Every structure is written in structure tokens, then in C-alpha cells.
Amino acid sequence: MAGVGDVGAVVSTIGHGTLPAEAFSALLAEAGVGRVVDVRSYPGSRHNPQFGREEMERWLPAAGIDYRWLRALGGRRRPLPASRHIALRHDAFRAYADHMATPEFLDGVDELLTASAELPTAVMCSESVWWRCHRRLLADHLVLVRRVDVVHLMHDGRRTDHAPTAGVRAADGQVVYDVGVTPPLPGT
């Protein structure tokens, strides 16, 4: 597994929200981002068509920023019937945490870190704030398992270093969300 010593990466995260394309690309340029890795499972938006995959493949390079879609890191996953991530209250987050143990996810992280070693990279999803998005869990993995620094870019220009989610721990090359929670007894 690659780590910061291997790839020298700092990964940023950003959510496009409802920003105009020009404001979004200006935020990226101000942060020194040269590549966007789209981590939406379905890279389109009816409400913000400028953030559809084909549109971004056109206007981001015109702004001097490379664009890649990486479905392996996308959200909207199905939870396992007996997820071990009991510290996560929302099914969508538990489902993504379950996905993070798959070879697809781990290969996607390798691809992300390779891309980040080539150009300063931001992973992007639609949710404006990182703590309500699967980018939060991806950042936990990058920080705790891969030892990569993660910075969250906000629409107002603020940059926040990632602090791992409450209840998370690293174990055997994965993150597990179970700290401080007693598992339910079988049959209850």
C-alpha cells in the first residue's frame, strides 16, 4: 500500500454544490489543484448541469485542470446485512464503510494516490460540506491507513485539515467505525 512517503500526496476534497463553473474552477486554482477526481457513482446533475461528466470534461481542462471520473470511490452503496461499522448512524455511511473493505475500493485508492503524485488533486462529489458526504470516510481511510494528508476545501475559501471521524480506528489496513459503541446482542 502506498503512503505519503511513497507518493508524496496531499489530497484535497471539494463538493461542487450549486457553484457556477467559474467560481468552482477559481476555488481549485486558488488551492493549487491541478486535477479533479470525481468520486460520484453517477457523475451527472440535473439541477447543476455544469457538473455533468461531459461538461466537466470540457470546461475543467479549458481552465487548466485535469478531470477524471473514478467510480470505484463513488458513494451510494448497499450496506451489508451485518455491518461492523456500528458507530455510524446513517445507513448510507455504513454502506460506504462496508464498500471500503472491497478490492474495488482499495484499487481505486491506489489509482487516486498515483494520480495525486502526478498533480495536486482534489476528490469531488456533489455535497458542499465534507462531513455530510462519503468524502469524510474516504478521508478517514487516506489519513489513518494510507498516511496521506487530507485538506477539505470550502466554498468560502477556507481549508480544513481532516480530523478522523469519532468512533473510527485503523485495523489490518482498513478503517472500522466501532469505537465507543457496544454491539447489539445476537437476536436483539
Model-derived regions, located:
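Residues lining hydrophobic/aromatic ligand-binding pockets adjacent to catalytic sites
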Residues: M1-T188
